[in-house]
Amino acid sequence: MSKSENLYHAARELIPGGVNSPVRAFTGVGGTPLFIERADGAYLYDVDGKAYIDYVGSWGPMVLGHNHPAIRNAVIEAASRGLSFGAPTEMEVKMAELVTELVPTMDMVRMVNSGTEATMSAIRLARGFTGRDKIIKFEGCYHGHADCLLVKAGSGALTLGQPNSPGVPADFAKHTLTCTYNDLASVRAAFEQYPQDIACIIVEPVAGNMNCIPPQPEFLPGLRALCDEFGALLIIDEVMTGFRVALAGAQAYYGVEPDLTCLGKIIGGGMPVGAFGGRREVMDALAPTGPVYQAGTLSGNPIAMAAGFACLSEVAQPGVHETLTELTNQLADGLLNAARETGIPLVVNNVGGMFGIFFTDAETVTCYQDVVKCDVERFKRFFHLMLEEGVYLAPSAFEAGFMSIAHSEEDINNTIDAARRVFAKL
């Protein structure tokens, strides 16, 4: 047995499923998950000494690559002064100044510890601000594991929420309405059925948890218009897209202004950080200035703030996003060409520094129903064969891939060459 296999066996006796987040268990692709010893630049190194070109990037935060010296040094320096104070610090102010400068729609920002905290707090704030209970989310979009967001859609354009995890009361989930991504008609139907009850829409501007689905041109502006028409707030969940699709996020890339924005992943540079913020009028409703309660023992802790500030300072440098987009385009184009050469039907979606691979005969993949029709079994074989080639992709057909500026053109070319060999075996 490999060291990863031994560790996985031991972990399963002590940790549910052997992992601390389900997708890491390789249940979407089968087999034994890799246990990682270290990472540097564009590469992961497992406990058995094998190296992999990494397109997971810790599920998004590592836009600069692993073990970036600016972030590492900032963490070491901050840790030398103490790990947590439970009191305000200067770095929290500097971080808030930087975030609100980079994302102009955020007049104010509150730091939390995860993307889940950010989305659940933003929804609570929207409900408190509007005095309404219902929310709209989209089929196939993931916004963390808060109870009101673990809801699936049934058939039809509009479905009253039903929980898709035990432990979520049906009475609570019923306030979540699920519509179809990229389908404005389904959203209007929800508002027309509940014109005075919907507090907010929460949406991924690029859906990254049904792989990678960009919005249709009219979709995000249409959501903004519907929120304005019916007096609801628009929450854009940029946990995945923030500072990755563009410096000011997908909202800037697509030209839509939300009332609230949720951030995570890149904002922490690899440390556990989330944030939510937006219009001053809305944020003023948050405790201690307003009645909507939110708190956190480790929120804004100095180590995480130092890492996040260092990361965003690097990400904001000229040319970073142009490089990131160009590398992602090279990979996407190369994979498509390799698939065509070997007769494999493939769609690759990409925006900024994220991408999605779909094995399908369809010409486009634009919503959850398109995604579930793709060939998941072929993806599983592709994943494991690419792993043998030294390329680490997301271990699920429903997760996006992530580029970093640490990836070289040689890394991209090696990945495309590996894919060409793998396609020939599928």
Swiss-Prot record:
Its main location: cytoplasm. Its cofactor is pyridoxal 5'-phosphate. One of its GO terms (biological process) is protoporphyrinogen IX biosynthetic process. Homodimer. GO terms for molecular function: glutamate-1-semialdehyde 2,1-aminomutase activity; pyridoxal phosphate binding; transaminase activity. It comes from the Bacteria. The keyword Cytoplasm applies. PROSITE patterns: AA_TRANSFER_CLASS_3 (PS00600). The gene is hemL. It catalyses: (S)-4-amino-5-oxopentanoate = 5-aminolevulinate. Keywords: Cytoplasm, Isomerase, Porphyrin biosynthesis, Pyridoxal phosphate. Disulfide bonds: none annotated. Pathway: Porphyrin-containing compound metabolism; protoporphyrin-IX biosynthesis; 5-aminolevulinate from L-glutamyl-tRNA(Glu): step 2/2. The keyword Lyase does not apply. Belongs to the class-III pyridoxal-phosphate-dependent aminotransferase family. HemL subfamily. It is found in: Cytoplasm. The modification N6-(pyridoxal phosphate)lysine is found at residue 265. One of its GO terms (cellular component) is cytoplasm. HAMAP family: HemL_aminotrans_3 (MF_00375). This is Glutamate-1-semialdehyde 2,1-aminomutase.
